[in-house]
Regions:
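Surface-exposed interaction regions that form or flank ligand-binding interfaces
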Residues: 1-56, 61-69, 73, 77-83, ...
Length: 174
């Protein structure tokens, strides 16, 4: 093989890899959207869940004179969410071996979501929706103490709710 053939082969492999990656990402996103719509249709059939045009949250809806903003956090059931401070939410895949010195797997757009003040007179409720579920949601209270976060806990202006807890969450916020 000469250098031209190698370049064409490498370019083809890169192109095929990119197409495969974006195809899989599109399928996963479509399935997640479908699952979210099903959860909300079962929980709140009267609301119209709209996809957001914003980059840092995915959905919004109006219910009982409140505007709900939803940031979706895709999770594995065996991982946990650790809220280290207002702007750093990280996924922990190693439940027993995690330390504060562990390199975090941070969620993007958290600062923008937490600091967002929409131009509305309605009360705004921000929800971080964990899809489909996670092992634990914990937050650091200080350097050494942590607390388990419940769906009813307002943490830095955001409710952290697992999709399996969504049905029990809404009666508590009305």
């Amino acid at each position: 093989m000469n250098s031209t053939e190698v370049i064409i082969l490498a370019g083809s492999l890169i192109l095929i890899s990119l197409i495969a990656y974006y195809s899989i990402k599109m399928i996963v996103d479509k399935n997640r959207h479908k699952a979210i719509m099903e959860v909300f249709n079962e929980t709140l059939p009267q609301v119209v869940l709209e996809k957001s045009n914003e980059r840092f949250y995915e959905y919004q809806f109006l219910n009982a004179d409140k505007l709900y903003l939803i940031k979706v956090l895709p999770f594995d059931i065996h991982h946990e969410l650790i809220i280290t401070n207002k702007y750093y939410w990280c996924m922990n895949a190693d439940l027993k071996g995690w330390k504060r010195s562990t390199v975090p797997d941070l969620f993007p757009g958290v600062k923008e979501f937490v600091d967002l003040i929409p131009a509305t007179t309605l009360k705004v409720v921000k929800i971080a929706l964990i899809m489909p579920d996670c092992h634990n949601i914990i937050r650091y209270l200080n350097e050494s103490d942590v607390a388990k976060v419940l769906p009813s806990d307002l943490v830095y202006g955001v409710y952290f709710v697992k999709s399996v807890d969504l049905r029990s969450f809404f009666p508590k916020t009305e």
